[in-house]
Amino acid sequence: MTHSPFPSWPDTAADLIAVATGRMAADMLIRGGKWVNVHTREVLDGYDVAIIRGRIACVVPDATNCTGPDTHMIRANGRYMIPGLCDGHMHIESGMLTPAEFARAVIPHGTTSMFTDPHEIANVLGLEGVRMMHDEALMQPVNIFTQMPSCAPSAPGLETTGFEITAADVADAMAWPGIVGLGEMMNFPGVSNADPKMLAEIAATQRAGKTVGGHYASPDLGPAFAGYIAGGPADDHEGTCEADAIARMRQGMRSMIRLGSAWYDVESQITAITEKGLDPRNMILCTDDCHSGTLVNDGHMNRVVRHAIECGCDPLVALQMATINTATHFGLEREIGSITPGRRADIILTSDLRTLPIETVIARGQVVAEDGHCLVECPHFDWPAAARQTVHMGKTLGPDDFTINAPKGANAVTANVIGVVENQAPTKALKFELPVTEGRVQATGDVAQIALVERHRATGSVTNAFVSGFGYQGRMAMASTVAHDSHHMIVVGTDADDMARAANRLGEVGGGIVLFKDGVELALVELPIAGLMSDRPAAEVAAKADKMMQAMRDCGCTLNNAYMQHSLLALVVIPELRISDLGLVDVRTFEFIPVIESPT
């Protein structure tokens, strides 16, 4: 796979100087706009931007001396000129789309730079899968920078994955052209305890002069937190409250605050800026996980910036947190993040800084979107058959695979139950007394059964437990091969027969999400690439995802973006309780605990 590197500043310097001094005509001139300067936090009226070879030559009050007969003139007509938006931490796979289709979906929303960690595909296809994502990313008309995944598996010994990423893999990847750093270091106990593999990955990244991504998903801000920071991670997006954001920034980390499809962590943390008055340079906006429905219906980073403003943030500060702060964090402030000479010409025209309508999007000096419509091609990688055949179940499953037996003679049991928390990634460790019928524990009330079906090595293994918070009613089951981060198959349901039907259906189609109610399939989203992504257009995938969300509501679920909650129930690095293919995990202690506590 080859790609054409974007011309560097040194390669274009002579032309940039010639245009800036009026000795050469610009390729493009944006005329008469309000220049939003994120370096000085100013809005300067009546400025022109001259562009040559995809880079900004000058930003001046009058650039008519830079024009020629072939100059593409864009009249801003007093609109604001803001830098293209940057997503500081995200997973493309969460959109259920390939990099090409993800780019096509977000370009009209003004996202021109993404810092993506493809650790989802790393767990399924290993280093080869990461390279496929990296290569398709480099083919796009916007900037998709890749962070080499650090933790596959996310927690060694607590789960098994399709592949493992090694320290040697990380060292090798640092030489790839699109790699800007190390993906989120999720094994935070490993870092705090100086695990040699984790430190080797961090060292390889630091020696390459690149950024180490963080993931500290614990409320403990004591010695474990201090040890984690001392290990080298430079940012963190797992904070959920003001104290988390302040603690990270005080220790020299960037606090990344996220608004994803189901993670609403901006409002609770941005008060560190808006109320406590801390310097906003060390705070960055990001999405982490957005599914296709959110991208198509609500937006991407424009949605996050608007939300920050609605939470009381000054619009110029919010824009800094989605542009120059992000670029600076990754050492790319001389490439992206501002409308200043030499930088890539990634520019948005908008008529309002608060509501942020994205009217024109320019990326690398090319108009890529107008009024919500993508105007450019987003080339596709030729995904091989091996990437499309990743669901290996080993056998056809039946209802007996989805039962939990009670201790002999028990009429009821006390069960450890995963408690879903709306709009947040952490869960609660709950206990419920559940009845026993004919020797089998029954899920009652708001408690449903959850199972993890092994799908990488065809073992036929099924691990069962209980979950609460979805509000499902009647006989139903939902299955998904998107099961962060091991990406086996999660099945949640109230009926063993429907759970078996749902699991087997995903085996037939090669991965995705499916929901059965009373034995009937209500919705299906096919995700044939690694069981995680579709290479169909975002609108098509979003329509199927919307149908899935409606099917969940029809089964009694009222959670906001419940699918995202569903997909994270196996992520054994975010407290408190999670399920893995090896058992029920208490992430507070990183130990397995029994599903059934004791007979009563």
Swiss-Prot record:
Domain of life: Bacteria
Catalysed reaction equations from the record: adenine + H2O + H(+) = hypoxanthine + NH4(+)
Coiled coil: none
Pfam families assigned to the protein according to its UniProt record, in alphabetical order: Adenine_deam_C, Amidohydro_1
Keyword annotations: Hydrolase, Manganese
Gene Ontology MF term list: adenine deaminase activity
Keyword Lipid metabolism: no
InterPro entries: Adenine_deam, Adenine_deam_C, Amidohydro-rel, Metal-dep_hydrolase_composite, Metal_Hydrolase
Keyword Hydrolase: yes
Listed EC numbers: 3.5.4.2
One record GO biological process: adenine catabolic process
UniProt cofactor(s): Mn(2+)
NCBIfam families: ade
Classification via PANTHER family: ADENINE DEAMINASE, N-ACETYLGLUCOSAMINE-6-PHOSPHATE DEACETYLASE
Entry's family note: Belongs to the metallo-dependent hydrolases superfamily. Adenine deaminase family.
Name of the molecule in the record: Adenine deaminase
Organism from which the protein derives: Roseobacter denitrificans (strain ATCC 33942 / OCh 114) (Erythrobacter sp. (strain OCh 114))
